[in-house]
């Protein structure tokens, strides 16, 4: 069997042989016929300008990806074609105590290019209930979280929960052992009182440093928490124990970033820096902090910097809620 290079060489030899025969025959005819000679010269003069013309892409080499970002040159305002949801704790509405306060905020956002019909202000009772069913359905979603050092809910874990999409399934710890298979595989516990204990198992399903029949020997990972994202050693089976009546535990895979969600911490000595959590890959900047004074001051600050915040986000590509992508069963 001939190689590709050999085949190409044979084709070139045959081509040049026939070309030489044609040229020889043409020269012979031109010598005997002035009319044929004039016709050949006319064809050569007609074709030559095309041969030396500018090449606009026939042989342009492709050296990289064609999937490049094309900047938007229209400079359209985002607010004219997008919806904006701002989520706030109900205590803000109680403190403001003004029936028209939402309309006021909407009118102020109008000065920043957001039509009043595109802005939605949604309150939530507490972070526990909100984290269980966030309903982040706008093109851009901003969550205001008031700092509370006494809260059982870990706000950095709430940030990880909201800033990523998760694919989850319920865990039946009475029937099965569970293991985490990768860095993106976590267990998410939610409820009013989540105390999680585990017993790692060896290949013979015997406890490592614990007894599978004695919960008192299990390692305790959380204590009376409302939300916990649990990380254990990958590739090791675990027997899990928790109070089913006050907590739900789900086996989850962290998927893509929710780039249309941003979290603003209100008050507190330091910012929720979810990017510093070793569980978070890749790093992100959609979590920030503003000083706490009064809730009116908070909303004024949000309005003033709304477009700066939006620039760190991306418009949603699908609806995000518990029934679709947040905690999909």
From Swiss-Prot:
Role played: Calcium-binding protein that interacts with rotavirus cell receptors once the initial attachment by VP4 has been achieved. Rotavirus attachment and entry into the host cell probably involves multiple sequential contacts between the outer capsid proteins VP4 and VP7, and the cell receptors. Following entry into the host cell, low intracellular or intravesicular Ca(2+) concentration probably causes the calcium-stabilized VP7 trimers to dissociate from the virion. This step is probably necessary for the membrane-disrupting entry step and the release of VP4, which is locked onto the virion by VP7.
Gene3D superfamilies: Glycoprotein VP7, domain 1, Rotavirus outer-layer protein VP7, domain 2
Any one GO MF annotation of this record: metal ion binding
Known partners and oligomeric status: Homotrimer; disulfide-linked. 2 Ca(2+) ions bound at each subunit interface in the trimer hold the trimer together. Interacts with the intermediate capsid protein VP6. Interacts with the outer capsid protein VP5*.
PTM description: N-glycosylated. The N-terminus is blocked possibly by pyroglutamic acid.
Protein name: Outer capsid glycoprotein VP7
Domain of life: Viruses
Note in the entry: Some rotavirus strains are neuraminidase-sensitive and require sialic acid to attach to the cell surface. Some rotavirus strains are integrin-dependent. Some rotavirus strains depend on ganglioside for their entry into the host cell. Hsp70 also seems to be involved in the entry of some strains.
Source organism phylogeny: Viruses, Riboviria, Orthornavirae, Duplornaviricota, Resentoviricetes
